[in-house]
Amino acid sequence: MGQKTNPIGLRLGINKNWRSRWFINYNTMPENVLGDYELRKFLKKKLYYAGISDIIIERTAKKIRITIFAAKPGIIIGKGGSEIEALKAELQKRIGNKELILNIKEERKPQLSAQLAAENVATQIERRVAFRRAMKKVIQSALKSGAKGIKVQVAGRLNGAEMARTEWYLEGRVPLHTLRAKIDYGFAEALTTYGIIGVKVWIFKGEVLQRKMNSDDTATPERKAPRRRKGRRNVNAKKN
């Protein structure tokens, strides 16, 4: 199943956390799920050139906290904070009367972000760069930044071929079945004259060891030895 499922969803609760965090009534869940989707779609489109690697949305009864991880946070903030104030005003119209808390954080190693790597490959394909060259360039930059392994896959009418096909490159290790492996996953689409080309990227950053359990939890139950009767055995009883 590791080869088929989304590696982020497969590792939720192990070494990955949810991107939408809230506890609400069951009846209002569809509304909030749709609201989070619309907010992410709006932010990704508006802040595309800022290099958005992740968006985390936290909701309470009266507040919404949005944390944006970007490779170029200066584009979002703007000169003197003018751009971020305009962004807050647009987001406030979308969320209504709830209090908005907007945090902008810098992606310290954008080369190790699978989402940014996938968008980079898609952008180069749209600019008519050879897809193999774009894939190899992303792989080299990720390995130089400390990645243990990376896999890049493209699918579609590559180079304008009549029949769609899938090609991929793999460097290093990408253990998708190992749940303790810290694997980042990203997906992007390249819009070309021949159709849409899908790009998927898996980046293996190392293994995350779980916290050591208490000695009481890990100790195996010991077998109790049978109790021996006190006193000497009557050897002559069997003979008689």
From Swiss-Prot:
The keyword Ribosomal protein applies. Residues 213-224 have a biased composition (Basic and acidic residues). GO terms for cellular component: cytosolic small ribosomal subunit. InterPro entries: KH_dom, KH_dom-like_a/b, KH_dom_type_2, KH_sf_prok-type, Ribosomal_S3_C_sf, Ribosomal_uS3_bac-typ, Ribosomal_uS3_C, Ribosomal_uS3_CS. Keywords: Ribonucleoprotein, Ribosomal protein, RNA-binding, rRNA-binding. Gene3D superfamilies: 3.30.300.20, Ribosomal protein S3, C-terminal domain. SMART domains: KH. Residues 213-240 are annotated as: Disordered. HAMAP family: Ribosomal_uS3_B. This is Small ribosomal subunit protein uS3. It comes from Nautilia profundicola (strain ATCC BAA-1463 / DSM 18972 / AmH).
